[in-house]
Amino acid sequence: MDKQEAKHINMPSPSACEHKSVEAYLFIDPLCKDCWEIEPFIIKLWLEYGKYFSIRHIVTGKVDGTNASSHKWNKPANIRFVWEKTTSLQGFSCDGKVHMQEASSTPYLVSMAIKAAELQGRKAGSKFLRKLQEYIFLENVSNPDCELLLACAKDSNIDVEEFKKDLHSASAKKAFQCDLKFTNEMHITEIPSLVFFHANSDEEGIKIAGNYSYDVYVQLLKELVKCEIEPEPLPPLEVLLEATQFISSKEVAFIYDCPQQEIERELKKLQLKRKVQMIEVKCERYWKWIAKEKDLV
């Protein structure tokens, strides 16, 4: 979710602390499940502390091998490594190098698609990414093709014709190359990785690699903001559902820190009011926000 979307979920007004004093960068591979599983943490952090930081997704996928010579950067990163852990990652090399692959390959095409969607705005890019991850991890789509990417564009309500034009455009390619360069400069060796920088300071950044408890992310944010910060009240359940459009009971329970059984009672009330539709996927319950009667499909 970005700043534009946040206004629909009652984000708080600025306090005595400097507004948006921290910049956060989430390094992801859209084909990695760990990057899908960190999203509820990011949503909760944004809802509670979003007035203190901005966030941007950085894609760490594969680059077209025809331009390999232009992707060798060795600029030192002004960053403090807080945690590094090794895990078995899906489709990502952890040797710190930018690897090359044919432009027709799935990782490259998917990365270009995310950048193409982002050309319509950060909110559009985030919606497209979430929809793409739903296809990959909930419907077991291991090799997203052009047809599926166009379906994601349509489902995320972005301009499909504009997306088609941008998918192989120089602008999308340049945006992806910038992400690869930034990934290399930050010495990202594990995904997901979250990097925090103070927006108005030359101090070193803080990087956390891998998935951790929510309190760890809050602790690091507080360390950079350097003043007392308190979480804002979470939005009403209906507002969250409308903003996310499609979310699991487990994710909602985590965000509101409530037992899943209690959350599902509230969700079923909304189902009776025909505001959400329950969809079972892989033994988990997901909830689709119904904007109009025709969405009941």
Swiss-Prot record:
What are the UniProt keywords, alphabetically? Cytoplasm
Q: Where in the cell is it found?
A: Cytoplasm
* UniProt cross-references to Gene3D superfamilies, sorted A to Z: Glutaredoxin (3.40.30.10), putative protein disulfide isomerase domain (1.10.472.60)
Query: One short Pfam family name for this protein?
Result: Thioredoxin_5
- In the UniProt record, which is one GO cellular component term? cytoplasm
* CDD domains linked: DsbA_FrnE_like
What is the annotated role of this protein in its UniProt record? Adapter protein required for efficient degradation of Spx by ClpXP under non-stress conditions. Interaction with Spx stabilizes Spx and exposes the C-terminus of Spx for recognition and proteolysis by ClpXP.
Q: How does it assemble?
A: Interacts with Spx.
Family stated for the protein in its record = Belongs to the SpxH family.
The name this protein carries in UniProt is ClpXP adapter protein SpxH
